Design a protein with these regions (language model features):
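Bacterial N-terminal signal peptides
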Residues: 1-5
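Short, electropositive alpha-helical surface patch
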Residues: 100-103, 179-186, 320-328
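Short aromatic-enriched loop/helix-cap "lid" or pocket-rim segments at secondary-structure transitions
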Residues: 133-135, 184-185, 263
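Hydrophobic, lipid-facing positions within transmembrane beta-strands of outer-membrane proteins
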Residues: 24, 67-71, 103-110, 154-158, ...
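Loop-centered beta-sheet repeat module
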Residues: 173, 177-234
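Outer-membrane beta-barrel pore domains
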Residues: 14-18, 49-59, 97-98, 212-386
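Outer membrane beta-barrel
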Residues: 29-52, 58-180, 208-212, 354
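N-terminal periplasmic/intermembrane-space "pro-region" immediately following the signal or transit peptide
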Residues: 7-47, 378
């Protein structure tokens, strides 16, 4: 898993593989006398698996899957300016109305670093919320919590990072709240009686700190944005991490209060008995995510992971009464094998159990949520193209 050893600590800004090797890049070969700061690197990320999917212990399907293929190109063109582009081949849309980019483009930004104390990033980037699971390159996560699964993590905007010391960083970020129209974000669209937001942006204040010789790591953030006229969203997110030697352990606490149901979990509870389903309003979500990783051999790593999550409504609206609607938990166990020392090649075996408990409010809407399981083996490899 990724090491939070150095700041700045922008979420998922690390390259898929390290770029400080001794092999000349294509630019260095073509332009041997060029500026020392002119460079570029390309990485290809590949993740495939074979998995069996179960509902209440009964096999539904077993199949092979290409979970993720991503290509990134990153580099710099002067001492102070760098850039990063990344595209996923597992998701696609026509250019969205708001940011004019396909959802397949995850990164498209330029970074200006005039000093060691300050840097500025503009373009499509990662929303700088807290949480270790959220922060990790998704290549490192076999199963996300529901909370992180439904966050629109890549948005166009601007962020400024202030590094007060090698172990303390403060990030102020303003990005779009959404990429496209409201109809693209909410499962049943924006309620007709609520006007569209004129400034659909979200502002994030993020603090990253390292203590105890970097063994204790914290990543806290607060985000607030406007979803529509009179409807706002709040995120409070925190990562508490211990990383030393072969051990990585963390506890994430993630909370969101949403004027409109951005996560769509409660909105999706409306079953066939609801003739005219609508997007829920005034929803809130809370998640606790815990993980313990142990690298018991240079070629072997194992971890156990669990999450406990709740979904509720904090103010009655329409069909949705105030109160708790669902409790969810997932339990995971994974063994990872790294056959080549110093390589990003990894083979894994993973077990997942996900359980749900619906309250009477959810069942009154016709909601159904059986327990599910998954058994998977897979391969992950990040290839440094140049």
């Amino acid at each position: 898993m990724l090491l939070w050893a150095l700041l700045p600590m922008h979420a998922q800004k690390e390259a898929l593989v390290a770029s400080n090797d001794s092999v000349d890049t294509l630019l260095e070969k073509l332009l041997p006398e060029a500026n020392d700061h002119l460079n570029a690197h390309m990485n290809l990320e590949f993740y495939t698996s074979a998995a069996g999917y179960f509902t209440e212990g009964t096999l539904d399907e077993a199949a092979f899957k290409i979970n993720r293929v991503r290509l990134e190109i990153l580099g710099s063109f002067s001492k102070d300016f760098s850039w990063h582009f990344r595209q996923s081949f597992n998701k696609y849309s026509n250019p969205h109305a708001l940011d004019n980019l396909s959802s397949s483009i995850e990164y498209a930004y330029v970074n200006w670093k005039p000093s060691d104390k300050f840097n500025l990033t503009i373009g499509k980037q990662f929303v700088a919320m807290g949480g270790y699971e959220y922060y990790l390159n998704s290549n490192k996560v076999r199963e996300f919590s529901d909370f992180n699964e439904y966050v629109a993590a890549y948005q166009a905007g601007l962020s400024a990072a202030f590094n007060f010391s090698p172990t303390q960083e403060l990030v102020l970020q303003v990005t779009n709240f959404r990429s496209g129209e409201d109809e693209d974000m909410y499962v049943y669209g924006r309620p007709a009686e609520i006007a569209k937001a004129k400034v659909p942006v979200i502002t994030t204040l993020n603090w990253n700190g390292l203590f105890a010789d970097k063994a204790l790591q914290f990543r806290y953030a607060a985000s607030w944005g406007q979803q529509a006229e009179g409807r706002n969203i709040l995120y409070l997110t925190a990562a508490n991490v211990y990383e030393k030697g072969p051990v990585i352990a963390y506890l994430d606490v993630m909370y969101s209060r949403q004027g409109l149901d951005t996560h769509c979990i409660i909105s999706d509870m409306q079953g066939p008995i609801v003739e005219n389903p609508v997007t829920a309003q005034h929803t809130e979500y809370l998640s606790f995510i815990a993980d313990f990783d142990y690298r018991f051999h240079p070629h072997w790593n194992a971890y156990i992971k669990g999450a406990y999550e709740t979904a509720g409504v904090y103010k009655t609206n329409g069909l949705f009464e105030k109160g708790l609607y669902r409790k969810t938990w997932n339990l995971q166990a994974c063994v990872e094998f790294f056959p080549m020392k110093g390589s990003e090649l990894m083979i894994f075996g993973h077990l997942l159990h996900k359980g749900h408990q619906l309250t009477g409010r959810a069942r009154a809407l016709g909601a159904v949520a059986p327990d599910t399981q998954r058994i998977s083996i897979g391969l992950v490899y990040t290839i440094p193209v140049f």
